[in-house]
Amino acid sequence: MEAVIKVISSACKTYCGKTSPSKKEIGAMLSLLQKEGLLMSPSDLYSPGSWDPITAALSQRAMVLGKSGELKTWGLVLGALKAAREEQVTSEQAKFWLGLGGGRVSPPGPESIEKPATERRIDKGEEVGETTVQRDAKMAPEETATPKTVGTSCYHCGTAIGCNCATASAPPPPYVGSGLYPSLAGVGELQGQGGDTPRGAEQPRAEPGHAGLAPGPALTDWARVGEELASTGPPVVAMPVVIKTEGPAWTPLEPKLITRLADTVRAKGLRSPITMAEVEALMSSPLLPHDVTNLMRVILGPAPYALWMDAWGVQLQTVIAAATRDPRHPANGQGRGERTNLDRLKGLADGMVGNPQGQAALLRPGELVAITASALQAFREVARLAEPAGPWADITQGPSESFVDFANRLIKAVEGSDLPPSARAPVIIDCFRQKSQPDIQQLIRAAPSTVHG
């Protein structure tokens, strides 16, 4: 485990900078993952296939226990692993296109297995009707015969003069490399066999140290996929739902964004403009009920979460009332299919309970927009109730308080109040003039009129 911790710590320092977790935090996270059965060994963390299950398990643990330490560490580690993997792929692609390496030796076929025996028969002087080399020469496209020169022995039979295989051309040497571009591995072999490889299909590649073949990453023509999806009908706009060739598929929210938002809530509070800006950015695109409820569980305490659920239900009831009056309401799917209801909007209908994939497939775009907008409005209401802003009129600079701290307290209180945005700046300037220390008040009075109004 120590070796894995050192590797991960080094990657985090490279890609996370000052926010990189300590070796102790990484070790605690690995121990927890092994204890929960998510990793058989610490080195399994390098496998991208294990990342999504780990993210889901740690997110669930953070929501149940209210402890996000391991989730935060995992978010940083996951970001470093993805960055390192992306950098490696980019480097491999560059090396391949520049001719600095790449490719792999093709697995031996029937011809290459027969070739040594045929060459042994030629060395013994046996007559062979058609050698493997000659068959290769017939099959290889656009190969030219290599001219023989006097005094040069043939590399097939060793004869200097009168070589019977003088017109036989040697097959090109295999392109030996380290597999730096595995997604192109096996393309030549499949084309040589006359098979048509569909665009975007995965090609088999050889894993180092293994004789068998394992599936490798695919190169997908996303422009063609987008055209095909556009021709089949309107795409699902839910985020984080990814549209694939087989239909919409759900993917978890990025752990780094969730942990950063949770840290902002703890440091700045719910009413902070920074917190509200991050929440609005995260919910700028429609989300599934599964993601909305789990996100609120992470950033809200038990009591605020209960208040949010009630406020969200009230907002959804408003949507249902509007959809009942208008059969062509967006939540009703423009009159196609059944009308929306509370169970559908909360993700509690048949096929949706605890199933984000089912929600992505069954919910309409208009329902997803209504779900997210209602959740955001409910969050704003809970923020005002859970953290009432202190009266800005009572804030005064203390005897030993710096002006910067006093200004921060005042600005936070004014921005969290119900004052209209146009009135906040004049109120702040007026409080600076009346509530600060006498020497600061003198400086403000002596300032140009553009400062103190």
Swiss-Prot record:
Region Disordered, residue ranges: 100-150, 187-218
SUPFAM superfamilies from the UniProt entry: Retroviral matrix proteins, Retrovirus capsid dimerization domain-like, Retrovirus capsid protein, N-terminal core domain
Site (Cleavage): residue numbering on this chain: Y155, H156, A166, T167, G177, S178, M239, P240
ATP-binding in keyword set: no
GO molecular function: structural constituent of virion
GO biological process, one term: viral budding via host ESCRT complex
Leader peptide range in chain numbering: none
Compositional bias per record (Basic and acidic residues), positions renumbered to this chain: 112-141
Superkingdom: Viruses
GO CC terms in record: virion component
Motif (PPXY motif): 172-175
UniProt keywords, alphabetically: Host-virus interaction, Viral budding, Viral budding via the host ESCRT complexes, Viral matrix protein, Viral release from host cell, Virion
Name of the molecule in the record: Gag polyprotein
UniProt source species: Avian myelocytomatosis virus HBI
Gene that produces this protein: gag
